[in-house]
Amino acid sequence: MMTRFACLHLFTMFLFTLLSGSSSAVITTESPLSMGQTLSSANEVYELGFFSPNNTQDQYVGIWFKDTIPRVVVWVANREKPVTDSTAYLAISSSGSLLLLNGKHGTVWSSGVTFSSSGCRAELSDSGNLKVIDNVSERALWQSFDHLGDTLLHTSSLTYNLATAEKRVLTSWKSYTDPSPGDFLGQITPQVPSQGFVMRGSTPYWRSGPWAKTRFTGIPFMDESYTGPFTLHQDVNGSGYLTYFQRDYKLSRITLTSEGSIKMFRDNGMGWELYYEAPKKLCDFYGACGPFGLCVMSPSPMCKCFRGFVPKSVEEWKRGNWTGGCVRHTELDCLGNSTGEDADDFHQIANIKPPDFYEFASSVNAEECHQRCVHNCSCLAFAYIKGIGCLVWNQDLMDAVQFSATGELLSIRLARSELDGNKRKKTIVASIVSLTLFMILGFTAFGVWRCRVEHIAHISKDAWKNDLKPQDVPGLDFFDMHTIQNATNNFSLSNKLGQGGFGSVYKGKLQDGKEIAVKRLSSSSGQGKEEFMNEIVLISKLQHRNLVRVLGCCIEEEEKLLIYEFMVNKSLDTFLFDSRKRLEIDWPKRFDIIQGIARGLLYLHHDSRLRVIHRDLKVSNILLDEKMNPKISDFGLARMYQGTEYQDNTRRVVGTLGYMSPEYAWTGMFSEKSDIYSFGVLMLEIISGEKISRFSYGVEGKTLIAYAWESWSEYRGIDLLDQDLADSCHPLEVGRCIQIGLLCVQHQPADRPNTLELLAMLTTTSDLPSPKQPTFAFHTRDDESLSNDLITVNGMTQSVILGR
């Protein structure tokens, strides 16, 4: 009897467990949704259930894409108040109201409406819309699409209604682990034509530009031929709605992040592809250059004033604070003279995102649009835009951006004197300046030449050769200068391959037909005798398929040359940062390059006769042979140690900003882990296609490392991936590589993997430790006034070459 009772008890417990983890089709008054249960859409595209975004006892009811990893939540019911009781459940009342009940604590959340109904149910559609439906009329009594969260899904809409003062907006999460309402709203405006805004409180944060039939004119990839997933309708009664229809992809979404970014995703079959994000760069942020300021969109965005305008505050402008904008250099004279020869006229500027505060004039043609503005002295600018018609500006031109290709033609009213100018005066000034500069340069060049001649006269022609003998570098050839000059066509510009940190590199061909690369040390560079001798001696002792091979050297008078094997494909940066050539290295090839560099590092750190710390590992020092195999080059800054030594300290900090580990940049301490840090930066560059010294994200100017950490924390890093690789990558492999890259750039050297561990991480699928949030110490820029190479000499430390 006891045995039978025990079996019955076990069966009951098993049945309860099975039911508690089951998936329901609908929620009714008789069948609520308990914690552990889920509600799936008909074709199992979406799922409703309880979840915890921060892996705590805090539970929320939400909707997410079913069977996608990581989970992407698109709507949350109880955003402001989580439940903590495991007995909580989602129910539907007899009056059609959805209720989230937290055990004995009562109602936590309610849909807030009641209906006269004989019966109703809640079900989840394949568009991700949770609906309460009347069982008799089949009419939707309530739906989640009317109460948006942070995500816009297929067939959902942003709306406004001036008569009722109602609007439907996106509201960001407070953080990526806190779904309560954050600081940002995404909405459309009631002006005609409407435009999209991200608002931070009551302050504009980002603007889409006015709607033009099928596109937003302020989003660069939406040109005149664009037909995308949006439709916008505005009526004369003061209401409008923007609907998102994405028919080309099964899964897609538009999310307003906790940091105020609009991100557009689509599932390409291999994972989420981030195909648009804003704001991202300076010009994306609302009013970055202030009134009458123009933000020029480029790899290094910059502000300038429209023609005829000058900075309102020159001092603030010089400090990089452009928000004060610009003011007119010469006031208009429209009222006094509107038709004569000295009347104001219009200056045209192309590829413009239409500024804010426009007014819709009519759908007339371009010439009539021009005439309307000419005869209205309050009209400061106009634009005739396909899909809109005539827009005019009677207020300050705010949030104007100039794109590199797409955009609209904007005509700005200027005083006649600003357009005519004084050409003769400009010519005279230019001639005087040119002549003065020529004379200064001539005298300077003559003085430098005289000093060089006098200095060289005191140097023995064979001084360098006496310091370096063939027996010191077995296997290397000594070339004479005449041979190298013939091979490189006397170092002609047509033979120049590029400019390195310590000089120029030229392509050459020896008499036997062998192609070579010649590194010619610049006399003005920071690499002197120590680095040059170091590179020759070191590289002669290293042989590995992922290290560049040196063939010989040439030392005559002040000339110092290194002769390398020629790399057909030059350096990795020529591919990675070129908009066309980057397409030649898909994800499998980039992953091979990452592994090849790691193998080269392993040889330097562990497998060679000498332990070598490179100290200047960066993308321009990775050369590619004809099969795109990577080879580490440029050993001028490397250090060699015996097998028991693992770190050293120098007072001479040399390297490249962005790639230098914190302990090396700040204290001069370097080790194998310093190269690991540089490798981590290099990995993130290869994955993203972005340059560490140029990348700047958000209004805070986040570095590539900061953005990689944020991306990995929120989406396992998939939106960091170069968008050109979407069709060739495996998301899990990319996410793993980003995690490895973040492990390599940890602040503490002890938290970084060594080279053996690094290669194991790249070649196996073993579990990886979770990285800590890195310290984003350096944010460098490629400004003309800054050098990419940091060579700060506070003393001299002599290299010591010891056997392993």
Swiss-Prot record:
Active-site residues (renumbered): D616 (proton acceptor)
Keyword Transcription belongs to the record: no
Enzyme class at the top of the EC tree: transferase
GO molecular function: ATP binding; calmodulin binding; carbohydrate binding; protein serine kinase activity; protein serine/threonine kinase activity; ubiquitin protein ligase binding
Membrane topology of this protein: Single-pass type I membrane protein
InterPro entries: Bulb-type_lectin_dom, Bulb-type_lectin_dom_sf, Kinase-like_dom_sf, Pan_app, Prot_kinase_dom, Protein_kinase_ATP_BS, S-locus_recpt_kinase_C, S_locus_glycoprot_dom
Domain of life: Eukaryota
Region named CaM-binding: 580-597
Binding site for ATP: L497, G498, Q499, G500, G501, F502, G503, S504, V505, K519
GO BP terms in the entry: recognition of pollen
Modified residues (Phosphothreonine): T650
Domain Protein kinase positions: 491-776
Record-annotated EGF-like domain positions: 279-315
Reactions accelerated catalytically: L-seryl-[protein] + ATP = O-phospho-L-seryl-[protein] + ADP + H(+); L-threonyl-[protein] + ATP = O-phospho-L-threonyl-[protein] + ADP + H(+)
Ranges in the topological domain labelled Cytoplasmic: 449-804
Residues annotated as glycosylated: N54, N135, N237, N321, N337, N376
Modification Phosphoserine occurs at: S525, S540, S620, S633, S693, S787
Cellular location(s): Cell membrane
Transmembrane regions listed in the UniProt entry: 428-448
Similarity-based family: Belongs to the protein kinase superfamily. Ser/Thr protein kinase family.
Official protein name in the record: G-type lectin S-receptor-like serine/threonine-protein kinase At1g61500
Taxonomic lineage: Eukaryota, Viridiplantae, Streptophyta, Embryophyta, Tracheophyta
